[in-house]
Amino acid sequence: MEIPVSVQPSWLRRASAPLPGLSAPGRLFDQRFGEGLLEAELAALCPAALAPYYLRAPSVALPTAQVSTDPGHFSVLLDVKHFSPEEIAVKVVGDHVEVHARHEERPDEHGYIAREFHRRYRLPPGVDPAAVTSALSPEGVLSIQAAPAPAQAPLQSPPGAAAK
């Protein structure tokens, strides 16, 4: 008795199936032993259980920021809820605002965690670097604002000069 054996490469067998997981049942030698499962096949089995392993949770991601930098106006809203006020430093260096936050390793519900980040923002033209202010809300949002540079008074003509 002769048993037919498929000699197609596995990638061709998978590509030629009408729909993944719905290929016609084949013979014993047509099955993909030892090849593992494709990611799509795993997700079809239990998509909700696998999603946390492939997607980074927003609470673990880097802080998010909303930045508004128009000429003469500067505003940053930065989510720093994982840091205490003592762990956050805001300083002006030249025409940049630098934000640094860090906390040492400490226990949390999953083990131990340490966090640190650095952000640097260029001040737009027309903004006074000496007028940069920052405030931390109770929700953990750091607000950094900068006022426009004071307008220079127009030069006055010397007394006795004729106006044209």
Curated annotation (Swiss-Prot):
Can you cite an annotated GO cellular component?
A: nucleus
Q: Does the keyword GTP-binding apply?
A: no
Domain of life, per UniProt, equals Eukaryota
Q: Which GO terms describe its molecular function?
A: protein homodimerization activity; structural constituent of eye lens; unfolded protein binding
PROSITE patterns, alphabetically? Answer: SHSP
Q: Which residues carry this modification: Deamidated glutamine?
A: Q66
> What keywords sit in the KW lines?
Chaperone, Cytoplasm, Nucleus, Phosphoprotein, Secreted, Stress response
* Signal peptide annotation: none
Q: Where in the cell is it found?
A: Cytoplasm; Nucleus; Secreted
Could you tell me which residue ranges the sHSP domain spans? 56-163
- UniProt modification remark: Phosphorylated at Ser-16 by PKA and probably PKD1K; required to protect cardiomyocytes from apoptosis.
Q: Positions modified as Phosphoserine?
A: S16, S157
Query: What's an example GO BP annotation here?
Result: negative regulation of apoptotic process
Identify its protein family.
Belongs to the small heat shock protein (HSP20) family.
How is the subunit organization of this protein annotated in UniProt?
A: Homodimer. Small heat shock proteins form high molecular mass oligomers containing variable number of monomers; these oligomers display a very flexible quaternary structure easily exchanging their subunits. Heterooligomer with HSPB1; formed through oligomerization of HSPB1:HSBP6 dimers; subunit exchange leads to formation of at least two different heterooligomeric complexes, differing in variable quantities of HSPB1 and HSPB6 homodimers in addition to HSPB1:HSPB6 heterodimers.
* Protein name per UniProt: Heat shock protein beta-6
Tell me the organism. Bos taurus
Q: What is the lineage of its organism?
A: Eukaryota, Metazoa, Chordata, Craniata, Vertebrata
